[in-house]
Amino acid sequence: MVATRLTRLPEYLFADLEKKIAEKTAAGRDVINLGIGDPDLPPPDSFTKSLQLHAADSDAHFYSSSRGDAGVRKAIAKYFKGRFGVELDPDSQICVVLGGKEGLSSLGRAFVNPGDSVAAPSPAYPVYAQGVATLCDGKVQTMPLTKENGFLPDLNLAEGAKMLFVNYPNNPTGAIATEFFWQSLQDFADTHPETVVCHDHAYSEMTFGDYVAPSFLQYTKNAVEMHSLSKVFNATGFRIGFCVGRADYIAALVKAKSQIDSGAPLMIQRAMADGLAGYRGTEPPKEVVEIRKIYGERRAYTEKALRELGLDVIESPATFYVWARVGDDELPFVQRALDHDIVVTPGRGFGQEGVGYIRLALTQPLDRIKLAMQRLG
């Protein structure tokens, strides 16, 4: 009865985690969920107040457009110029999306034909391989990310692909890209017109210390880049973000979206624009600074605690994920954690190269993370 492509999809990793959490919770257990990257912190007050304000706009109840509100696109262009030094045409190089997952999936529908190859890292956010390649009846060209290669893909493995996905700062590993990698990716994008290069920049603003994440559009115009407010403003449920880059790529995305949705709700788009307006060049608003501080403290504690437990921890100056090797097979560790009412994500859920690793999402208060480490000890 169902489409054949659905039978090729594994159960979505986080749906399985949510099921286990629900079972534990229903049994009255005190579950500490470090499995899913859904921030425990609330959105900044300024964001929710902006949302309330724009809900009363006289046109808030109308359809938007698949490209996004014109005023919001201008605000995105201003933010991008200040934050990254890249000029964008609001009318042709920006599309508002319903969060990164929808944006990435719609990009696939815009470009991937049955049988086309999609170059995707492994381990990686599952949407590249499943939501794009599989749901578009394409094939996956795997680019392994390993500790030995710095969790950076060999771009030779992307030869012949219709689309290529990269993501830095990286989920699940927390890795950041080197200058040499960015230049190599620029060369690939500029010399492979048959391949649509997409940089998923969902964690651009979740960085710590002196590290500042660049945009790939600082290197080339021959790409698109996906941005999300889910993490930086603790707004996963609002489903809002934007895709920017090469005009013909954006036009194809808009055309695909025109058959899928009618744009994000206007009040959410405008709250996003107000949030981005808080940036002063590369300097983030104070709310983002505070969010970074909280996650940075959680990361520093967790990395140290896991090392003391004997795990091989991949240290990182970005994202709210900790990636750690636990052995040749991570499933016994995952089950032991679950026996102690702690949910961690098995690395194999992000691809074959994730076997032997676990990912912890630092989306619990520090005292709960400390309790989890005590239980594991």
Annotate each language-model stretch with its function.
Residues 35-38, 53-73:
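A glycine-/small-polar-enriched, mobile loop at the entrance of the PLP active site in fold-type I
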